[in-house]
C-alpha cells in the first residue's frame, strides 16, 4: 500500500530518530566515475578550420565520448568527406584524448592529443592535371593522416587553444610539392561564446593556420572565421546557423589554388558560406 503524506512524514521522523537503522536505506549512491555520451549531427556543409571538406555537400557526423570525474577524457568522431578533397577516401575518423582541469569557477585549462585518419585516401589517387597537381605529374604515395598535440585555457566566455602538428600536416611535405616537411605547423584558435536567455548562444571564432613550409612560391598560411547562433532544446536536441569563411584565395581557390575533380569540376575551398546544423546528444 502506498504511503499517505502523513505516513511519509512519520517515516521521515522515524528515520531521523533511528539513523543507524534507516541510514543505509536513504544513503545516496555515489556518482559513477565515468560519464559516457554520444552525438549525431547533420550539417549542410562540413568545414574544417574554414576549408570545405565535402565539396559543398551535406555531411552526417557522429561521435562518442568518455569523461572521468578526475578530468581525463577520450573520444572518437567521424564524418563523410569528399573524394575530391581526399582522393580515394570518403570518410574521416578522428580519435582524441586528454585532460581538462579547473582552477576556479572562471578559469580552466586543457591538454591533449587529436588524430585525424582518412581510410583509403592517398595523394596518388588524385586527378593529375588539377590546380594542385598540374600535368604532367607523377603523384607520390602519401596519406593525409595527421596527429596534433594541443593545449588551451578558458576564462569565462573566452578560450584560446594552440594545436601543434606532430606529423606532416595533412600530407604536406617535399613529396607533395612543399618546400619541406610540415610537422610543427601551428593552429591558433580564439573562441568567444556568449550565453543568452532561453538556451540560445552566440559564438564567434577566429583561427590562424601557420604552415611550416611553402608550396612553390605560394604561402599556404591563412585565417579562418566562424559566427554561430545556436539553440538547445529538450531531449538533447540542438541546432545552429553559422557563417564560415577563410582567407588566402591564392592557395585555396582557382585558378592558382583550390582543387579540381576528375571530371574537371573546380572548387573554391575557402569561400564564405552558411552552414546549417541539426543534432542530438545522448
Segments and roles (model prediction):
Residues 227, 231-237, 265-282:
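Outer-membrane beta-barrel "beta-signal"
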Residues 1-35:
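Cleavable N-terminal export/targeting peptides
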Residues 30-44, 72:
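Transmembrane beta-strand segments of Gram-negative outer membrane beta-barrel proteins
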Residues 65-71, 100-102, 152-158, 193-195, ...:
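Structural signature of outer-membrane beta-barrel channels/translocons
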Residues 34, 56-60, 89-93, 143-149, ...:
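Residues that define the transmembrane beta-barrel architecture of outer-membrane proteins
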Residues 88-182, 261-265:
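Outer-membrane pore/translocation modules
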Residues 42-48, 78-82, 101, 115-119, ...:
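Transmembrane beta-strands of outer-membrane beta-barrel pores
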Residues 70-76, 105-111, 157-162, 198-204, ...:
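Repeated loop/turn-to-beta-strand initiation elements of outer-membrane beta-barrel proteins
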Amino acid at each position: 500500500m502506498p504511503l499517505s503524506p502523513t505516513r511519509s512524514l512519520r517515516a521521515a521522523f522515524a528515520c531521523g530518530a533511528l539513523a543507524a537503522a534507516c541510514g543505509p536505506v536513504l544513503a545516496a549512491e555515489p556518482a559513477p566515475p565515468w560519464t559516457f555520451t554520444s552525438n549525431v549531427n547533420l550539417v549542410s556543409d562540413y568545414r574544417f578550420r574554414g576549408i570545405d571538406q565535402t565539396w559543398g555537400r551535406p555531411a552526417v557526423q557522429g561521435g562518442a565520448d568518455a569523461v572521468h570525474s578526475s578530468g581525463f577524457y577520450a573520444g572518437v568522431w567521424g564524418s563523410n568527406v569528399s573524394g575530391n578533397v581526399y582522393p580515394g577516401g570518403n570518410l574521416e575518423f578522428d580519435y582524441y584524448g586528454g585532460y581538462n582541469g579547473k582552477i576556479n569557477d572562471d578559469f580552466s585549462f586543457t591538454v591533449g592529443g587529436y588524430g585525424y585518419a582518412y581510410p583509403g585516401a592517398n595523394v596518388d589517387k588524385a586527378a593529375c592535371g588539377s590546380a594542385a597537381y598540374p600535368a604532367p605529374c607523377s603523384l607520390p604515395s602519401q596519406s593525409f593522416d595527421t596527429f596534433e598535440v594541443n593545449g588551451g585555457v578558458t576564462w569565462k566566455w573566452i578560450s584560446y587553444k594552440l594545436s601543434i602538428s606532430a606529423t606532416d600536416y595533412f600530407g604536406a611535405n617535399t613529396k607533395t610539392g612543399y618546400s619541406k616537411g610540415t610537422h610543427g605547423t601551428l593552429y591558433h584558435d580564439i573562441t568567444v561564446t556568449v550565453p543568452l536567455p532561453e538556451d540560445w548562444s552566440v559564438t564567434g571564432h577566429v583561427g590562424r593556420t601557420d604552415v611550416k613550409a611553402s608550396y612553390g612560391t605560394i604561402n599556404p598560411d591563412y585565417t579562418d572565421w566562424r559566427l554561430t547562433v545556436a539553440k538547445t532544446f529538450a531531449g538533447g536536441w540542438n541546432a545552429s546557423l553559422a557563417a564560415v569563411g577563410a582567407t588566402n584565395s591564392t592557395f585555396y581557390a582557382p585558378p592558382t589554388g583550390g582543387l579540381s575533380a576528375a571530371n574537371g569540376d573546380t572548387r573554391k575551398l575557402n569561400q564564405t558560406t552558411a552552414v546549417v546544423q541539426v543534432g542530438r546528444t545522448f
